[in-house]
Amino acid sequence: NDNLEEQAKALFNHYFIQNTENLGEWQDGVLTDIAQYLNGLAMQKYPAMPNEAGLPVLKIKELGQGQCDTNSDRCSSLIKPEYIISDGTIIFSWSGTLLVDIWCGGKCGLNQHLFKVSSAKYPQWFVFYWTKHHLNKFIRIAKDKAVTMGHIKRCDLEISKVKIPS
């Protein structure tokens, strides 16, 4: 899988970063033009009720390890559906440890400090690689702000340039 990931990233970089003159009719945009970045909830405010199995909470730790486990917090399964994460969802940790990944760890609730990244207009690979393209810049921004936990702000997404089809 790592080899496939590297090949896909190399193709993306070749066509969308290094050789943009070959794109044809494309225009400049920013990350928020191609995707919605939904911030998670403070899940401690939505605990699983007594006698409710609830859902595991997706936090930065779980994203980094690729799964929830028996030590993961649990939240109510009655949270708004947009905060319930399923396999195949792009998740972007924007605070603390910054990373972008496609979640494959099962159904869970989206915690604060994580964005659910989705688009009704563009394919998932397109949104994923543009977000990932800006990750090192976001890490530098967060490091410069690190008093307690370094983070980026929504305005950083709003100025991160992308190429989009005309």
What annotation goes with each model-predicted range?
Residues 27, 44-52, 141-144:
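Short coil/turn segments at secondary-structure boundaries
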Residues 91-93:
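A generic structural signal for residues embedded in beta-strands
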Residues 32-47, 54-87, 104-105, 109-110:
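Sequence-specific dsDNA recognition surfaces
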